Amino acid sequence: MNESPEKDQRHRERMERKKAVVDEKIAQARDERGVLLVHSGNGKGKSSSAFGMVARALGHGMKVGVVQFIKGAASTGEEAFFRRFPEEVSYHVMGEGFTWETQDRQRDIAKAEAAWKVAAQLLADPDVGLVVLDELNIALKHGYLELDRVLADIQARPAMQHVVVTGRGAQPGMIEAADTVTEMSLVKHAFKAGIKAQKGVEF
């Protein structure tokens, strides 16, 4: 494609201005500490993004803790993969399936309480660099756990430990406490077209 020299020059000037803005923001970001991230919303990718961070953390030699609060009725590709690294990843599947499958509130509460005991231990361990609390938002949304207690344990974690909380319906208090919040938006999903959940894509 033949571009005019004037167009090339305008592009270069725009990119120079953009680089200056980005460089300035990078220079101003001097605080270094563990961050709390929340992945919520109705779209696909909340847990997938969190497990991508697990892979990234492992690449940096960090130890990781994973607690799954709701999922657990069926095996997943991420569980099968990360269990290959027992020294680096402490992986705990504590749920018994989605809430509409269990249909037993008291049992769900008991499972969530047991899961939080495991999570609290990971959050107190200075050797663990990243903790993934998968579908914790669901447990909080249904009142299986007390938000104040959960936030207290998260905020008392080691200074450089990162935490990722996933699940729909993030509570306002969780959003307020978080450093980074991402709302996954559902634009289109294969399931609505009658396509079954696919291995390697959904699980």
UniProtKB/Swiss-Prot annotation:
It is found in: Cytoplasm. One of its GO terms (molecular function) is corrinoid adenosyltransferase activity. Residues 1-21 are annotated as: Disordered. Its EC number is 2.5.1.17. It holds the Pfam family CobA_CobO_BtuR. Keywords: ATP-binding, Cobalamin biosynthesis, Cytoplasm, Manganese, Nucleotide-binding, Porphyrin biosynthesis, Transferase. ATP binds at G41, N42, G43, K44, G45, K46, S47. Required for both de novo synthesis of the corrin ring for the assimilation of exogenous corrinoids. Participates in the adenosylation of a variety of incomplete and complete corrinoids. This is Corrinoid adenosyltransferase. It comes from Pseudomonas aeruginosa (strain ATCC 15692 / DSM 22644 / CIP 104116 / JCM 14847 / LMG 12228 / 1C / PRS 101 / PAO1).
